[in-house]
């Protein structure tokens, strides 16, 4: 009895899946300190570890909170932890959470003043602000119609900077506004949006006189929300808004010039790493947020003014040959920069602008001309996916010199309108990524959680650029006890199924794994790229996201059911169907309905969106059908199931094995000749066959899509059948009209399994109204005998008088 009770208790703990982590509080902490944090959400049962995407933070004292809605921990932040956003996930015994963020800063934290019940602010008027010191980070909330005021003391000539992390905290579309006010409540500096910080803001000013200054924080339209958290940095730190040059070569030592700070340009020498990174300006203290720097092996030139026309295009001498890059700034009003380069005939070049992608406000427009003829060759405004950076593919028509110009779409300019133009050959590239599972939830199924002793199929999507190739898919760093099976990817496939299978004794653990695709012929490789969209809004686009080449992969606690797939050992033929049998093996105590989908289908093969194994059942049939042009081939298919855990404790997701499915050539084709009849008049439908492959024995033929009141019995055919007449019975009330959807299902049996062909689509049966019955000829009726009354005889008309008689008569009178 005790053992049974222990089993039931342990099994009940299994029925809690997909931990839902919503926020980590506080939203950040100071480097070199320990911070007690709370993970809040739902179904946070039995926390195991925090998965960090960047180094610099360690965890101790990870423990469950008072219920499944919270987890407590202590973050130990290293003194050399990178400033800014740190991405992480919480792994519980039964799953891995969505990615959430924690921000590391350089200053100690201050909490916004609240009443004892934490319901109201104590800093919502200019007259009664919250007093703070410089070089602190305030953790606050911008409520609806809320304005938060913080007062700080400053000296004349001192730099006072403020920067806010709001939207970038990744909860909602928060648009903060910040201002620095003097004692008379006049704004001496303010900012709403900035290209560098997206919808977050920052401003900096040289203090005009000693005294108290007030910092105002609010939502720009006063549309606050209890989830509009912010981190407000206040201090004497530098706050430049741009850096030049914006790029360099790997390992190169260059001098960066940070501009936009009120004290003037800040110069800083730096050795560039091997890949793109972000640089902090340091002047006493550091900028809270860094500025992006691109790293590329391309040779580059920094612009030299004047270069505002094709004749003045830079450089005038020693023209660089493509590939090359140019750096510049559209600094003056209406500025247009021109550059010269040398091209060779038939070079396939891609001209790519980096502006918004390196957080410049520039909305670029580029045009390319031949220096010899001064004729325009091509131009472009927005082409880069996700940002309004220009991109232009250009085939050099002949050897010679060419000029390219760049300007802002609206003619804007400024010291922060920095750009980089890369002119380089179009190189082939490949990569893979997990496609979004839901339009408004970019994180759904973006982690790979495999129940112990079970399986999961994921379907990466392939991106090929300037190459068509087959691919091999490999991994590095999977958890112990987890095996991956991936097919060889044909060049015509843009998606493919990958099976992960966890051993029954696999340790519950996780890793940040990397995956690679490789063209076995050329040796070209590409990464598995992932973009987590923290804040995105339908057609408005993505406001804050995180890009990574690491995927969270975990072995989690065992699931209460498993899935098996049976694929008949016969081919699926074009215009045919095949039934897949899906069996669920349920553990005692679990009997929830199970929704089953086929996550990947071979080309030309279709299936229902989903099928369901209802409560009390353990089997379901999923029917595949093939288009007429489905390519012949051998494929691997599997199915994935989702079910709600008992007591609604999350979603369970797992898959079957991958099983071989053959799409083969059809055995025959047929055409249905048009037939016509009348209601109540039986007739025949003639089908003529085109035998493509011999088959053994007899096949069954069934005529489908007959109208109401019309039936046809199944028929038998053989491999040598050329034509068949199918008797049809037509009732008196059969639907009249032209019925043009008839088709025949021909079922051939092979090794006891059916091979269904659906053929002759568009066959026509016309049921005409019966002709009207001929009218009977009526016999003429005999007229009734009527006795006529004798009418008085009329006097005969008088004979007209002749002229002579008329004269005689007149004379007599």
List each model region and its residues.
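Surface-exposed, proline-enriched loop/turn segments that connect beta strands in immunoglobulin-like
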Residues: 23-26, 243-245, 434, 444-446, ...
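Short beta-strand and strand-turn-strand segments in soluble, beta-rich domains
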Residues: 55-56, 386, 476-484, 599-609, ...
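Acidic, Ser/Thr/Pro-rich low-complexity intrinsically disordered segments
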Residues: 17-61, 66-70, 79, 90-93, ...
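Bacterial N-terminal signal peptides
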Residues: 3-13
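Ser/Thr/Pro-rich low-complexity tracts
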Residues: 16-142, 218-229, 233-322, 327-331, ...
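Short proline/glycine- and polar residue-rich coil/turn motifs
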Residues: 63-69, 80, 195-197, 207-208, ...
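Extracellular/luminal low-complexity segments enriched in Ser/Thr/Pro
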Residues: 73-81, 268-272, 459-463, 467, ...
